[in-house]
């Protein structure tokens, strides 16, 4: 991925996993610090969480903290019946199944798109070729009186079918980029 952080001009991004909106991010001073907030949780509350890009070995890691939410796409599409929230007040019930999945099969594009920019204007996007959730990292927090939290890591994988310069992702118009 291009390392020139000066290309990052916006402070708020929509976060898309497999081209689906899942929330929005607040950018810090560097590309390594991103804040994350779900737009919708339930009718009674709006809560916040954290997402950060950090190095984990040779691959960057997206660490995502998601607060109690009614978004079924995150858990339904990613984990099937393995992990699922049931919203009841401030509580989340969850279940772990024995279904096995390959994280590489779940790897999808991840996109940071600036808030307030037209959906078809990709000039300032931050595009990751392959983003995958680490289901083994799912943890739960909170108590009866506070919002429950679900924390899960997302890994950014290298895509060897892309050019050597852009094998993690690119800044800018990713729709105009071809494989080298």
Report the location of each language-model feature.
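A generic short-segment signal for beta-strand/edge and adjacent turn/coil regions
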Residues: 28-36, 78-83, 94-97, 117-125
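Charged, amphipathic alpha-helical segments
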Residues: 69-101
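Short linear motifs in intrinsically disordered
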Residues: 1-9, 96-107
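Solvent-exposed edge beta-strands and adjacent loop segments
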Residues: 1-78, 130-149
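Surface-exposed ligand/attachment interfaces on beta-rich extracellular proteins
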Residues: 43-50, 91-99, 178-180
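Acidic, glycine-rich flexible loop segments
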Residues: 98-141
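Mixed-charge, glycine-accented linear interaction segment located at domain edges/termini
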Residues: 124-180
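Beta-strand secondary-structure signal
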Residues: 61-65, 111-113, 151-155
């Amino acid at each position: 991925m291009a390392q020139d952080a000066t290309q990052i001009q916006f402070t708020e991004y929509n976060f898309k996993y497999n081209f689906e909106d899942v929330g929005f991010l607040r950018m810090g001073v560097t590309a390594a610090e991103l804040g994350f907030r779900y737009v919708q949780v339930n009718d009674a509350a709006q809560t916040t969480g954290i997402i950060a890009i950090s190095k984990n070995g040779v691959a960057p890691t997206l660490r995502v903290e998601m607060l109690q939410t009614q978004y079924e796409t995150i858990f339904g599409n990613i984990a099937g019946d393995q992990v699922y929230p049931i919203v009841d007040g401030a509580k989340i019930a969850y279940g772990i199944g024995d279904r096995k999945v390959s994280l590489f099969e779940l790897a999808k594009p991840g996109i940071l798109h600036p808030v307030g920019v037209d959906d078809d204007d990709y000039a300032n996007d931050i595009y990751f070729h392959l983003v995958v959730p680490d289901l083994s990292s799912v943890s739960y927090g909170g108590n009866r009186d506070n919002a429950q939290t679900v924390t899960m890591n997302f890994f950014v994988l290298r895509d060897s079918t892309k050019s050597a310069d852009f094998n993690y992702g690119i800044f800018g118009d990713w729709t105009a980029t071809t494989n080298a």
